[in-house]
Amino acid sequence: MRSTFRSVVFMFVFLNLLTFVAAQGLPAGTGGDIEGILRRGKLVVAITAVDQPPFYFVDKNGKLTGYDIDLASKMADELGVKLEITRDAPAFNDLVVLVASGRADMAVSKLSRTLSRAKTVKFSTPYMTFKQGLLFNRLQLAKVASEGEINSYVRDYKGTIGVIAKSSYANYAKTNFPYAQIKEFPTWEDAVRALTNGEVLSVYRDELEIKKVLASIPQSSLTLKPLYFTDLTDPIAIAVKSENSQLLYWVNIFLENQKKMTADEILANYAN
């Protein structure tokens, strides 16, 4: 009986010791949930190393600006802390790693909310939703489909599609166009260059990015053809560490009070 009692006491002490040691392993002020952010006095927000105007970009005066930067600044102000931007993520998928590892409190970086990423981090409600779209090389498209055949051609698309490597659209392409030949490029600019050079038949991204390309190329209607999907959308959301439920709850309430903008409104208000 005495032996059993000693065993129970030992187990109780051991479990409490484990809890204490685990707690000591998290230095004060480094947590990404609200308490840790307030204690630290700053909100660490991750964006990619490559500019994504109009969401975040360095303007002609050398200032980091854009829609996502303004959104992050408002959140820091509401929390009463300073904003720190980290650009250690080379690609969009790398943002998820930064947040999951605790090196950033959140990612506010035109980040698509996908099932694969949601295995690692938690996402807010979308603060923006775009239509997905294909942008075709019009000359190359005319060789495989007439104007009236384009919709049926796309439903069973077997052509080449250019996407950004390690992006949500690399995954979307595999799911939505299983018979297509998918070519990954380091940047969107590289993909668009391949499109205009005729190296790929189309590029795949959201409506905002496609509209930016069309606006940047003189007489683009003669060389390029956009196709937007009403049934395929791209929800843009904020990612936080899976354990930080209170922070996620706060972010969702914050977003409820923000005006949702369309792709055209963002382009008009944040012209690079």
For the regions a language model picked out, list residue spans one by one:
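Short beta-strand-to-loop elements that line the ligand-binding cleft
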Residues: 82-91, 163, 180-187
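Hydrophobic residues within well-ordered alpha-helices
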Residues: 75, 98-100, 154, 195-196, ...
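A ligand-binding cleft/hinge motif common to bilobed small-molecule-binding domains
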Residues: 93-94, 110-119, 171-175, 196-197, ...
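Flexible hinge/capping segments at coil-to-helix
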Residues: 125, 138-160
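Periplasmic-binding protein-like
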Residues: 49, 128-136, 140-141, 207-256, ...
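Extracytoplasmic small-molecule ligand-binding "clamshell" domains
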Residues: 25-110, 119
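Alpha-to-beta junction loops
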Residues: 43-44, 80-82, 100-109, 159-160, ...
